UniProtKB/Swiss-Prot annotation:
It holds the Pfam family DeoC. The gene is lsrF. Keywords: Cytoplasm, Schiff base, Transferase. SMART domains: DeoC. It catalyses: dihydroxyacetone phosphate + acetyl-CoA = 3-hydroxy-2,4-dioxopentyl phosphate + CoA. This is 3-hydroxy-5-phosphonooxypentane-2,4-dione thiolase.
Length: 291
């Protein structure tokens, strides 16, 4: 029982000052629960509202592709330079050190391979396991215009509903149907559908014409995929243009871990995303950091 004689009555309540609570201002997150906003504040830098995600989840359908043969040797040295790690639960448990203390976006869709129809995915992770792994978000593909469009949208809806119950953001990743053009009209459609379903983050591709319309028409943050390996200067230009036109960050894999110098490249990408460096300045940084 409390010692009532030792309880001192409070005196300084600062009655002349209204109570404040610093809000985490991120596009589309104002009505989200505290836990979900807290996870998003780990993914997106609270100062810049941007993020540099390092994607190395490719093995879930590609196997040990170039650069991902040994995650512990090729990818682990990059962890400290990334804001966020995007990977599968298998790699997270077997390779990623728990003490790295980086937010994780967990790949939560799968059940396909490059030998089959890529759009034929299922939810591959239960939400309680994503929570058990201390993930900050879960991610799944959505294939608008593909043979399995309906199933991929159902997968996203299932994850969103499960995520809302536990405060877990969901990132919808826009895969491209075989017969769909990679243009502004398609990605405006795909990103908007995913956001309308309730995804809190959208990962999509940058397009040269009309990307600002894609970003403006999507009510939640967009991060761009790196896509196929480009020359470093071109990849940095893509990053710069995407950020300049409304993207909230990048989720890059091959353009970092297949670079001539992956550490130098992720540092250059960070300079573009968080410090508004031009592609030219960032490429100069890449060359100066290159071993």
């Amino acid at each position: 029982m409390a010692d009532l004689d030792d309880i001192k009555d409070g005196k300084d309540f600062h009655t002349d000052k209204p109570q404040t609570n610093t809000l985490f201002s991120l596009k589309g997150c104002g009505a989200l629960d505290w836990g979900m906003q807290s996870r998003l504040a780990r993914i997106f830098n609270p100062r810049t509202r941007k993020t540099v995600m390092l994607a190395f989840d490719h093995g879930y359908f590609q196997g040990p592709t170039t650069g991902l043969e040994r995650i512990d040797i090729n990818i682990a040295p990059l962890f400290e330079y990334a804001d966020v790690l995007m990977c599968t639960r298998g790699i997270l448990r077997s390779v990623v050190p728990p003490a790295i203390n980086k937010p994780v976006v967990l790949r939560a869709s799968g059940a396909n391979s490059i030998l089959t129809e890529l759009s034929n995915e299922a939810v591959a992770v239960a939400m309680d396991d994503a929570v058990r792994l201390n993930s900050c978000a879960a991610a799944a593909q959505v294939y608008i215009g593909s043979e399995h469009e309906h199933q991929s949208i159902k997968n996203i809806i299932q994850l969103i509903d499960a995520g809302l119950r536990v405060g877990m953001p969901i990132m919808a990743v826009t895969g491209v149907g075989k017969d769909m053009a990679r243009d502004q009209r398609y990605f405006s459609l795909a990103t908007r559908i995913a956001a309308e379903m309730g995804a809190q983050i959208i990962k999509t591709y940058y397009v040269d014409k009309g990307f600002e319309r894609i970003a403006a028409g999507c009510p939640v943050p967009i991060v761009i995929a790196g896509g196929k390996k480009l020359p470093e200067r071109e990849a940095l230009e893509m990053c710069y243009q995407a950020i300049d036109q409304g993207a909230s960050g990048v989720d890059m894999g091959r353009n970092i871990f297949q670079s001539e110098d992956p550490v130098a490249m992720i540092k250059a990408v960070h300079a573009v995303v968080h410090h508004n460096e031009t592609a030219e300045r960032a490429y100069e940084l890449f060359l100066s950091e290159k071993g």
